[in-house]
Amino acid sequence: MNERDGFYLTPSQSGHPFAPTSATLTSSQSGYPTAVSTTLSRADSRSNTALAKAGDVGEAIWYNKCTDYVHKIIRYYRCNDMSELTPLMIQFINTIRDMCIDSNPVSANIIKRAQSDDDIVRHLIGLQKELRQNSVAEAIGSDFNIFQPSFVLNSLPAYAQKFYNGGANTLGKDALNEAAKQLSLAVQYMVSEAVTCSIPIPLPFDQQLANNYVTLLLKRATLPDNMQEAVKSRSFVHINMINDLINAVIEDLFAGGGTYYYYVLNEKNRARVVGLKENVGFLAPISASADIFNYIAQLATQQGKRPDMFENAAFLTAAAHAINSPAAHLTQSACQKSLSQLAAQCETLTRFVFMIMNHNTVPTTRG
């Protein structure tokens, strides 16, 4: 009983004694219950609104993360761009793909237009003859010659739509003119440079491969098998220059070299290297500490380290034996690798054939 007000307090049946949503007060004289409203209901409504807003924000964050991940997967399958994918994400993608392949196939209606490769070749030849007009390709004398009007009418609009149209759905005349202007300047400059240097214009594959290699290295992404083979073969000049530069920096900084490559480092790493050399030079004479690798090896040997007979730096740092090697996360079998390479080659050949057909023919006008 409340001695001050003369009422009996009956808590609500909500089960929470400290936060009742309502209270029933009973008069000690009349015995009739009296309902008194409290402000707790409004507080609960405000808290529920805040929780709902927090839940919406959390759902939006997860939605954005999932959408971003899906975009990365789509870009990976369309452009083979793995620069923003971690090894765990690639393994997750491969797991989903394997699950879809191993699961029961979905029934679909497919119209088979060709029974064999010969039928496909005959279809392409017939299509080429159908699109050809006035024997334009034969008059040029070479099927690989792009200096003809059909290239401007077929291939150039696709290039202008991709890079100079500003994202519009329809191709504008200004975008086509700008693309033609830029391509003309680029070809003229490359021809002039080639004649000046007595070096023919190379195919862009080497430079594009080097750009992809640098991008993957900066992103610490998994290197594809073809990229690893290109690095091992040392058949590409730009990739060799990148690897030689990295090795030259390490040799110059830690193996008795000079200070030539200091400007390559940022201020933080430059200070670290200078401080490391000063500290090592303080611990030992300059003649003994010039090569930091040998100095550390001598200290370890003096402390009792005995290297194994078959242990060497090449074995320990080889990609196949490294724990954090990108190859450790690749679980493709030989059959899967062969199928992937065949699929890439098939798509490349298909695009190449259609590109030749496009710039070797002029579209016909139908009345």
From Swiss-Prot:
The keyword Glycoprotein applies. Residues 1-31 are annotated as: Disordered. InterPro entries: Baculovirus_Gp41. GO terms for cellular component: virion component. It is found in: Virion. Its main location: virion. Transmembrane segments: none annotated. One of its GO terms (molecular function) is structural molecule activity. Keywords: Glycoprotein, Late protein, Virion. O-glycosylated; contains N-acetylglucosamine side chains. Residues 10-31 have a biased composition (Polar residues). Belongs to the baculoviridae gp41 family. This is Structural glycoprotein gp41.
